[in-house]
Curated annotation (Swiss-Prot):
Compartment(s) where it occurs, according to its Swiss-Prot or TrEMBL record: Nucleus; Cytoplasm, Cytoskeleton, Spindle; Chromosome, Centromere, Kinetochore
Protein name: DASH complex subunit DAD3
Major localization class: nucleus
UniProt xrefs under InterPro entries: DASH_Dad3
């Protein structure tokens, strides 16, 4: 299948023809041709936009086209997002680790306090016994 290119004059006649004024066409044919005309205009716009995006140079013949700029910018953004994600993950890990450390210290502190309270027992006379040694024995 081969495609042939038409002159711009052929395209402009298709675009500018007013099918509503043509007496040889039925109203349905007029509407169908107007819809084809509208679709043709939209396809031309899409084609022009795609051509701008896929150009390897800008309008002045220098530098890179907009699609290449977009791809490069997206790559840079992706790299930055990876760094941000890594730093965020590290910060969250650090916070969780600090919370675990604090909870562990509190647990150890409570255990030591309980051990001290268990080791210091008072007898009936109010004397404090330290690890089995009473104050009276001194």
């Amino acid at each position: 299948m081969s495609f042939t290119t038409k002159d711009k004059s052929d395209d402009s006649s298709i675009i500018t023809t007013n099918y509503a004024d043509n007496p040889n066409l039925s109203p349905i044919e007029q509407k169908i041709l107007q819809q084809y005309q509208l679709m043709n205009n939209n396809l031309i716009k899409v084609s022009n936009e795609l051509e701008l995006l896929t150009n390897t140079t800008d309008e002045f013949g220098k530098g890179k086209g907009s699609s290449i700029h977009l791809v490069e910018n997206l790559r840079q953004l992706e790299t930055k997002l990876v760094f941000v994600y890594t730093f965020f993950k590290g910060a969250v890990y650090s916070i969780l680790n600090a919370q675990d450390y604090i909870a562990e210290q509190e647990t150890n502190g409570l255990e030591e306090t309980n051990e001290e309270e268990d080791g210091n027992e008072e007898d009936e006379s109010g004397n404090v016994e330290l690890s089995g040694v009473s104050a009276d024995e001194n």
